[in-house]
């Protein structure tokens, strides 16, 4: 964070597990470093995993087996414990997995944008070997419904001035 601030580099956080709010101290450190090195404020972005479908149930049901398979493979390679459905549900509820209906994903995304003061968000859509047609549906819903709704939510409840 300090080095990025020192050299005036933009920041994008790859948050793939756990609550995004735990990265707030890093964002603040980056902002302080920009200020200390007399750099102009720069955009801050975030990259996380997600899947958007017509309903929460459809999104969860579709994404779960692909997410599980992807994490099982990574777990075998890295010696991690095997993923569970409870872990999947927890990542959706409080973590950095943006899975659900357009409204659910937009609401969670707007909250994350506010907490971290983000100006950009990169959705790594459809974790695992999700079929092409379902990936295209996620892309369409994200662009047509999620993003406009996020903009509405942000406009309705502006942040506290910390956005980069």
Task: State each model region's role.
Residues 1-17:
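A conserved active-site cap/scaffold subdomain adjacent to cofactor or substrate pockets
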Residues 12-14, 45-47, 122-124:
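A cross-family glycoside hydrolase active-site/sugar-binding cleft signature
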Residues 15-18, 124-135:
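Glycine-rich, proline-tolerant flexible connector loops at the mouths of alpha/beta enzymes
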Residues 19-119, 151-164:
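An alpha-helical appendage that flanks or caps ligand/catalytic pockets
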Residues 55-58, 131-141:
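Short glycine/threonine-rich loop-to-helix capping motif typified by GTGT followed
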Residues 102, 106, 136-143:
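Short, amphipathic alpha-helical "lid/cap" segments that border enzyme active or binding sites
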Residues 140-154:
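Alpha-helix-loop-beta-strand connector modules within alpha/beta enzyme cores
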């Amino acid at each position: 964070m300090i080095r990025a601030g020192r050299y005036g580099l933009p920041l994008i956080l790859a948050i793939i597990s756990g609550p995004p709010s735990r990265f707030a101290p890093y964002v603040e450190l980056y902002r302080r470093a920009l200020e200390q090195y007399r750099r102009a404020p720069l955009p801050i972005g975030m990259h996380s995993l997600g899947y958007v479908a017509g309903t929460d149930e459809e999104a969860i049901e579709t994404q779960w087996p692909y997410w599980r398979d992807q994490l099982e493979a990574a777990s075998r390679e890295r010696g991690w414990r095997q993923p569970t459905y409870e872990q999947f549900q927890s990542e959706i509820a409080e973590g950095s997995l943006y899975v659900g209906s357009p409204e659910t994903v937009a609401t969670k995304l707007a909250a994350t944008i506010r907490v971290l003061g983000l100006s950009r968000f990169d959705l790594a859509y459809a974790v695992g070997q999700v079929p092409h047609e379902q990936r295209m549906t996620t892309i369409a819903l994200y662009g047509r419904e999620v993003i406009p709704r996020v903009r509405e939510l942000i406009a309705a409840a502006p942040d506290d001035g910390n956005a980069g």
